[in-house]
Each structure stands twice: as structure tokens, then as C-alpha cells.
């Protein structure tokens, strides 16, 4: 199962995504659920890299994209850029929610603000 866990710390202007696991919907290379989950993580990583290039982050983001274990964490430089970064994370979170809705046996999402 793919588990996508979103985190935020508004007081520190931080947002994060940790994606772990494999869907197992089909054989490697033919697993549309895994491919969908992966492209969402890669899309977020690219957007966060572009935020860094625009000077919107306080520090370089932590981006690790590995098969079965990806982490994307960043800290915005101010409230305005935090709103932009958070919006990007929320769009990606919506994608994972759609995957979990359509493939609940393969994808789970821990959303921003959701109790553990």
C-alpha cells in the first residue's frame, strides 16, 4: 500500500510530504496506481524546486525521491510565500485523495491537520 502523509507547521512556515510503500495493483512497470502516486510526488518536488529558484524558500528544500520512499520538505521565507507553498501541497494532496478514493485498497492519505 502507498501511504502519503502530509505535514505542516504554520509557526515555522514548513510543509512536508512523505510517501512510502508500493501499491501492488499490478506488476512493476504496469502499476498505474504506483505510477500515479509517483508522478504526484515528482510534480510536487519540481514545484518546490521552482519555488526555491524564485527565492521563496528560507532554506534549500529536502527532496528525496526513491522507489517506495520519497520525502519533500520545505520552509517558506515569509507568510506570503508560505501561502503559495501550502497551496501547491494542497493541490497535490487533492490528487492523493482522489487516488485513495478510487483505489482505497492501494492508497491511504494522512492529510494536513488530520489526527494520527
Describe each PLM feature range:
Residues 1-32, 42, 46-116:
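N-terminal intrinsically disordered, cationic/polar leader segments
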Residues 33, 37:
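Short, conserved glycine- and acidic-residue-centered signature motifs
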Amino acid at each position: 500500500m502507498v501511504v502519503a502523509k502530509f505535514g505542516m507547521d504554520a509557526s515555522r512556515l514548513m510543509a512536508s510530504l512523505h510517501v512510502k510503500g508500493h501499491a501492488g495493483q499490478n506488476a512493476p512497470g504496469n502499476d498505474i496506481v504506483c505510477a500515479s502516486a509517483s508522478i504526484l510526488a515528482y510534480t510536487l518536488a519540481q514545484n518546490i524546486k521552482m519555488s526555491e529558484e524564485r527565492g521563496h524558500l528560507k532554506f534549500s528544500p529536502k527532496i528525496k525521491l526513491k522507489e517506495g520512499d520519497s520525502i519533500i520538505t520545505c520552509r517558506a521565507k515569509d507568510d506570503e510565500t508560505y501561502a503559495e507553498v501550502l497551496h501547491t501541497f494542497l493541490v497535490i494532496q487533492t490528487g492523493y485523495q482522489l487516488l485513495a478514493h478510487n483505489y482505497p485498497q492501494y492508497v491511504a492519505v494522512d492529510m494536513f491537520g488530520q489526527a494520527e
